[in-house]
Every structure is written in structure tokens, then in C-alpha cells.
Amino acid sequence: MKRWAIRIPNRTSQHNVSQEKVPAVPPRPLLFTRDFGLIWLSQLMSQVGDGVSNLALLWFVYSITGSPVKTTIIGLIHTIPPIVLGPFIGVYVDRLPKKFFLIGSNVFRAVLMGIIPCAVSTDTFTVNLLYGLVFLDAMAMAMFSPALTSSVPMIVPRAQFTAANALIQSTTSLGIIFGPAVSGVGIALFGSQEVLCLNGATYFVAALCLGMVRLRAAQPSAVEPETTGGSAWQDFKEGLAFVATKQRVILLLILTAGCYGFGASALSTLFPVFARKLLGLGPVEVGYLWSSLGIGLLVMSIVLLWCTERTLADRVNIIFWASAVSGLAIVALVWMKDIYVVSVLMIMIGGGMGAFTPIAWGVVQELTPRMMVGRVLGLYGTGAMTAAISGISVFGQITERFGESMGIAGIGAIFLLTAFFGSWLSRSIRNRERAL
């Protein structure tokens, strides 16, 4: 019996033993895996492109109109498609191949932000035409963002969701660091329209990289049943019911994201106005300051790579501390006139802002069934963007009526409110973990 007891485990559990030994081999860093590395490279190219085009767009409108309100229209237009179409786009992200959205969006943006500005003469390249291009670009982004985030679980292990999200955000950081600086120099040398024209190539390269990515099919398990197959309207209602009744932590997350978006979108849209009016800076200097924000984002993205072993509640608590630091640094901008001090504050603000999105995406990815991630992200985007468009509008009016200092102070207060919601969300998740 003793020999029988030894032989049977050795013979029947050989496969299991080999499986247990696999984790002992250190996994390859995410950036050096084929599929995630290609996604990261594609995002780097498109984010650098965004960094170049964003400053060029805002500077073009403000230099022509001289109006903070008309400048904020750029930001407002960017938020309309996610608000109106976000939940329904999420339904089709769950139903259709995600590469269709990933590749198609980048090709479409290359045509919009590259080829069209090249084809239109300087005399006919008006602010109204630019508004139209921005609206179509926002539609492409509304399709791309949920497709990208819901693709992460198809190529990355669950334990590395936050790390993967942080690495994806690091491309945003690098885009903010290099994009505006290149854009500022390009605007000074050539002009806004020419910068947009040359920038279209970045989106074509991004599409090429995404074309080589291999996404695993999402296979529903016993605990994650198939949730698609009915009508699109039925799928939409299932996603709404999941957020509203089955997983209310995500509903609180959307509320927190709305508060964050209310302040962050206003800061991003109005920053050229603040820098030009309060500090008297030109496009090159504004580009460098914007790059400082990107440095902070990059540092936080790197820090989050070491937070994957923490519980979800502990990771969410980082939002509380990061938002509080950002809020205080934004308020301090009111009194600081030295450009080097302002650069340090912008790094602090960027670091605080950099914590939110990777952690928030991780909450959605970990608490949502695989076949429903697109719909939940669509609802998340609608809530966040509705708040963002409100923040841009409100602070555009505040800045125009009461001055830039009042606008900055108000944005800082919103970040402090985000810190409160982050603490509340962390406690709610901790209570949920204890209940389980």
C-alpha cells in the first residue's frame, strides 16, 4: 500500500506537478512580451501624436479668437461622442472583434488629423472646420478607448492588470513629455496647420503595430457566463443592471471618476490660457510646462508597477493621497510666478493625476465579467465625460468672468473633493473584501 500510495500521485499528478512548477520561472516583463509590447508601442506612437496635436489645436483656436470660452469648445467637443454613444459603443466592443476598433480608429484619425489638414489651404482652414475635425476625432477615440482597456485581460494575467494599465498610461506620460515640446517648437517654426499635417504619420504607425497583435478569445467560464447573444438593446440593459444593482462599487467608482474628470478636463483644456495670462509664456514655454506634467504622470506609472501585490482596496486608497497632493499643488499655482517652481508643481500635479486611470481601469477589469467589460467601460466613460464636459464649461465661464486665479483655485478644490470620494471608494471595497 505504501508503494501504491507513492506511485499513483507520481503518475496521475505529473501534469499538475509540472503546472505548479511554472510560476517558479520568473515571468517575462510585460513590455518584452510580443503582444503587449506591440500594444505599448502603438500607444506610444498615438499618444505622442495626441500630445503634438492637442497643443496645436488649442493654440490655433486661442491665437485666432483670443477667447478662453471658444478655446474650451475643443475640450467640449471631445467629450460629446463618449457621452452620447459610449454605452452603445461598449455593447459592440463586447460583440465584435476588438482589433476592428483598435486598427480602424487609428487609421481614421490619421486621415482626419494628417491628410485633411494637408489637403486644405491655409485660407479655408478655419476654426469651424477644426471643430468638425475634432468632433470626428472624438468619435474615433470613443470607440478606441473601451476596446483597448477591454483587450488587456485578453493578453495579460489578472494579477498584472494594474501594472499593464500603468504601462499603457506611461505612453500618455511620454506623449505629454515629448508631444507638446515638439508641437511648441513646430508651431513657432511652421504654424499649427503644418504641425497637424506632419503628425498624421504617428497614427498610421500605431495602426500597423496593432495589426500584428494576437488577442485571445474571451472564453466565459461557469462563474462568468456568456452575456451576449441577444439583441444589442438587451446587452445594453444587462450592462446597466450590472452597474446599478449587482456591482454598486463600480457605480461609486463612476461617481469618483466624474469628480476627477470635472477638474482634470478643465485643467488640461485651460492650461494654455492660464500659462499665457498668468505667466506671460509663449507656445514653446507652455509646451515645456506641459511636458513637466507628463514627467509626473510617468513617475506615477512606474511607481504603480510595484503596487500590483497590494489588495484592490489599498490600490484604490492611492487615489485618495494622489488626488489630495494634486489639489494642493494646483491651488499653489495661484501664487507661484517662477517658472521653475511652477514646473515642480506641474510634476506633482501630473503624479497625482497619474494614479487615477490605471487603478480605476483595474477595478473595472477585476470586478466585471470578461464578456461585459466593454459595456461597463462605456457606462464609465459616459459618466466621466458628462462630468468632464460640465467641468470644462463651468471653469471656462469662471475663468472668463472672474479671472484665471479663481479658475485654478476652483479646479484645485475639485481635486480635493476627488480625494474624499477616493477614500470612500477604498473603504467600500475593503468592506466588500471582508464580506467575501
Q: What residue spans do the PLM features occupy?
A:
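Helix-loop boundary and gating motifs at the non-cytosolic
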Residues: V22-P81, A241, T245-L293
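Substrate-agnostic recognition of the 12-TM MFS/MFS-like secondary transporter fold
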Residues: G37-N54, I77-V93, P97-L112, L129-A188, ...
